UniProtKB/Swiss-Prot annotation:
<protein>
    <recommendedName>
        <fullName>Large ribosomal subunit protein uL3</fullName>
    </recommendedName>
</protein>
<comment type="function">
    <text>One of the primary rRNA binding proteins, it binds directly near the 3'-end of the 23S rRNA, where it nucleates assembly of the 50S subunit.</text>
</comment>
<comment type="similarity">
    <text>Belongs to the universal ribosomal protein uL3 family.</text>
</comment>
<keyword id="KW-0687">Ribonucleoprotein</keyword>
<keyword id="KW-0699">rRNA-binding</keyword>
<dbReference type="InterPro" id="IPR019926">
    <property type="entry name" value="Ribosomal_uL3_CS"/>
</dbReference>
<dbReference type="InterPro" id="IPR000597">
    <property type="entry name" value="Ribosomal_uL3"/>
</dbReference>
<dbReference type="GO" id="GO:0006412">
    <property type="term" value="P:translation"/>
</dbReference>
<dbReference type="InterPro" id="IPR019927">
    <property type="entry name" value="Ribosomal_uL3_bac/org-type"/>
</dbReference>
<comment type="subunit">
    <text>Part of the 50S ribosomal subunit. Forms a cluster with proteins L14 and L19.</text>
</comment>
<dbReference type="GO" id="GO:0019843">
    <property type="term" value="F:rRNA binding"/>
</dbReference>
<dbReference type="InterPro" id="IPR009000">
    <property type="entry name" value="Transl_B-barrel_sf"/>
</dbReference>
<keyword id="KW-0689">Ribosomal protein</keyword>
<dbReference type="GO" id="GO:0022625">
    <property type="term" value="C:cytosolic large ribosomal subunit"/>
</dbReference>
<dbReference type="Pfam" id="PF00297">
    <property type="entry name" value="Ribosomal_L3"/>
</dbReference>
<dbReference type="GO" id="GO:0003735">
    <property type="term" value="F:structural constituent of ribosome"/>
</dbReference>
<keyword id="KW-0694">RNA-binding</keyword>
Length: 209
């Protein structure tokens, strides 16, 4: 069964284990999520739980969002995602999901939106090596050859300069170091995608513990 919760990235700090090892952790604030809808095989063709996190201002909410949230008896949410593989029958619409569904030592996958870097060249974007800087070289940070003459075109997927970051990224098999049920916090070993205050989705590890 897949478990999942939505949260907000607060930042990073560090903890010390019982044997004195320093552990870098990311703090995720996961206030109680609300089940907005249950997707079923009969009605939707697949099973999933639709959950919401963080109340949305009424002035920024449209009629459809208000009606959808009212069915669950809650306020419209800013961040709404689906958790596939969840035990749908174990939940009811309007039910709250809290951080206590996870425990220390559990392996999880974290999905977020990476930091936007704007338009970047091939060295920063793809990690390519730069050219010589002296001896008459005119090639320093350019992308290099586009390909051979014969096709008369540039193949799709050619690594070139362009927009970098601001895309969905999932990091797998991260470890839950600690769960604070009083403050609704999850402490996750290592870093997770996104800037501070960005939203993330935390699910059970696909590749298992």
């Amino acid at each position: 069964m897949t478990k999942g919760i939505l949260g907000r990235k607060i930042g990073m700090t560090q903890l010390f284990s019982d044997n004195g090892e320093l552990i870098p952790v990311t703090v995720i604030q996961a206030e109680p999520n609300v089940v907005l809808q249950k997707k079923t095989l009969e009605n939707d063709g697949y099973e999933a739980l639709q959950i919401g996190f963080a109340d949305k201002k009424e002035s920024r909410t449209n009629k459809a969002e208000k009606g959808h949230a009212e069915k669950a008896g809650t306020a419209p949410k800013r961040y709404v995602r689906e958790i596939r593989g969840a035990e749908v029958n174990s939940f009811e619409v309007g039910q709250e999901i809290k951080v206590d569904i996870f425990e220390s030592g559990e392996k999880i996958d974290v999905t977020g939106t990476s930091k936007g870097k704007g338009f970047q060249g091939v060295i920063k974007r793809h990690g390519q090596q730069r050219g010589p800087t002296t001896h008459g070289s005119h090639f320093h940070r350019a992308p290099g050859a586009m390909g051979v003459i014969d096709p008369m075109r540039v193949f799709k997927g050619k690594k070139l300069p362009g927009h970098m970051g601001s895309e969905q990224v999932t990091i797998q098999n991260l470890e839950v170091v600690s769960v604070d049920t009083d403050k609704n916090l999850l402490l996750i070993k290592g870093n997770v995608p996104g800037a501070k205050k960005s939203y993330v989705k935390i699910t059970s590890a696909v590749k298992g513990n």
